[in-house]
Amino acid sequence: MNVSKARITAIGSYVPERRLTNDDLEKMVDTNDEWIVKRTGIRERRIAADDEFTSDIGYKAVQDLIARYEKSVDDVDMIIVCTFTPDFKTPSAASLIQAKLGIQNTGAIDLNAACAGFTYGLHMANGLISSGLHRKILVIGAETISKVTDYTDRTTCILFGDGAGAVLVEYDENEPSFVSFNLGSEGERANKLYCTGLAEQMNGEELVNTGNLVQSGREVYKWAVNTVPAGMKAVLEKAAMKRNEIDWFVPHSANLRMIESICDKSGIPLEQTLYSLVQYGNTSSATIPLALDIGVREGKLKHGDNVLLYGFGGGLAHAGLILRWTVPTEKN
């Protein structure tokens, strides 16, 4: 039974101005445009300026939301920022965004579930609002992955970019957005995708490339193309829905080949899939809100559409949900 009382009422996004194309990368590492497109589907990614950080781009995504939907955020009572690249270890990026927005009397927390972060953030927002503890929550997926990317490592630097997306979630028991969720984590595989912190070992393995993102691409690929279809099946069962009732599938935009394999295994046509990787690369927790906003701007997402979101990545963690699209037509 659906007990959600939370509705997504607005969306916004922001990407930095600087473009890093495949041709640019060809001058930096042993690669080329054809090789990158064939294996990943990515054509370019955005890169934050030296003085531009996660709180800055997250704030700009909220500003976009406010301008397009004429929303006030003065009475927001919780800010959840989903990121693994905060400006500082402390204070949180959420607190910095709260200050930039000038909101008083609001909670502010960062949530680190890497590429599954945004879907975990929506899960938290739905629970906090449906329980009656909160009425209005900003959920922001924002990353500046370029600042933890080794641009001599072609296995990672071709993939990642920077960007931010934000949604406003409000109390509404008459037209809730959220239908069902499915969450999971396999920490025993944590050393397949990591960015080092204080510890120098994980699962008995010496960690490498201190301070930068490290990925065992083939291992993560094999895990994702099996785990995500199973998770999609579970979230459909919890909603008592069939896959042909889904209008749009929005997976984490890690790699187009991976998305194609997930679609093939789950029986969802690629034509019903929204992704943001072609123009923005893998932006971790920002890929799903960026893809949703692309769907809005291109007129694909319609009121009442059933949308299946699935985030997956570092942890290795995953989180999926089904929502009914309830965002009204933007005012501007």
UniProtKB/Swiss-Prot annotation:
Keywords: Acyltransferase, Cytoplasm, Fatty acid biosynthesis, Fatty acid metabolism, Lipid biosynthesis, Lipid metabolism, Multifunctional enzyme, Transferase
Active-site residue numbers: C115, H252, N282
Chemical reaction(s) catalysed: malonyl-[ACP] + acetyl-CoA + H(+) = 3-oxobutanoyl-[ACP] + CO2 + CoA
Family to which this protein belongs: Belongs to the thiolase-like superfamily. FabH family.
Domain notes: The last Arg residue of the ACP-binding site is essential for the weak association between ACP/AcpP and FabH.
HAMAP family, per database record: FabH (MF_01815)
Protein name: Beta-ketoacyl-[acyl-carrier-protein] synthase III 2
Organism the protein comes from: Halalkalibacterium halodurans (strain ATCC BAA-125 / DSM 18197 / FERM 7344 / JCM 9153 / C-125) (Bacillus halodurans)
Gene: fabH2
